[in-house]
Amino acid sequence: MACGLVASNLNLKPGECLRVRGEVAPDAKSFVLNLGKDSNNLCLHFNPRFNAHGDANTIVCNSKDGGAWGTEQREAVFPFQPGSVAEVCITFDQANLTVKLPDGYEFKFPNRLNLEAINYMAADGDFKIKCVAFD
């Protein structure tokens, strides 16, 4: 995938919320939101897969520490629809990242890197970002 939006120096602190809203492409196969320290140190690789890498209608999450991927976590809840607008809200603390999906469903992913601030965000794939907000 070619690189889409990249933002750095975010300084997102524990308890603060990152809201990302955008349009899912009508022919979407997958998209990615990466959060962390930099591209080689990700506390969250959030990858909804409509039909990609052998997965269908599955959210795959992972972390990357010093360039090495961790163990994938899969979520069966999949509220994303091709051709629709979707919003994801992500908060974190020392233990977990909490991801709130468009249907209100929330799940947790462990903060394996123990980051005290999220400074990096990258988005890619079949998702056109319309708004990024910090609450």
From Swiss-Prot:
Record function comment: Lectin that binds beta-galactoside and a wide array of complex carbohydrates. Plays a role in regulating apoptosis, cell proliferation and cell differentiation. Inhibits CD45 protein phosphatase activity and therefore the dephosphorylation of Lyn kinase. Strong inducer of T-cell apoptosis. Plays a negative role in Th17 cell differentiation via activation of the receptor CD69.
CDD domains: GLECT
Positions annotated to bind a beta-D-galactoside: H45, F46, N47, P48, R49, H53, N62, W69, G70, T71, E72
PROSITE patterns to which the protein is assigned, alphabetical: GALECTIN
Record's protein name: Galectin-1
Residue numbers of N6-acetyllysine PTMs: K13, K29, K108, K128
Keyword Protein transport: no
PTM sites of type N-acetylalanine: A2
Domain Galectin: 4-135
Modified residues (Phosphoserine): S30
GO MF annotation list: lactose binding; laminin binding; receptor ligand activity; RNA binding
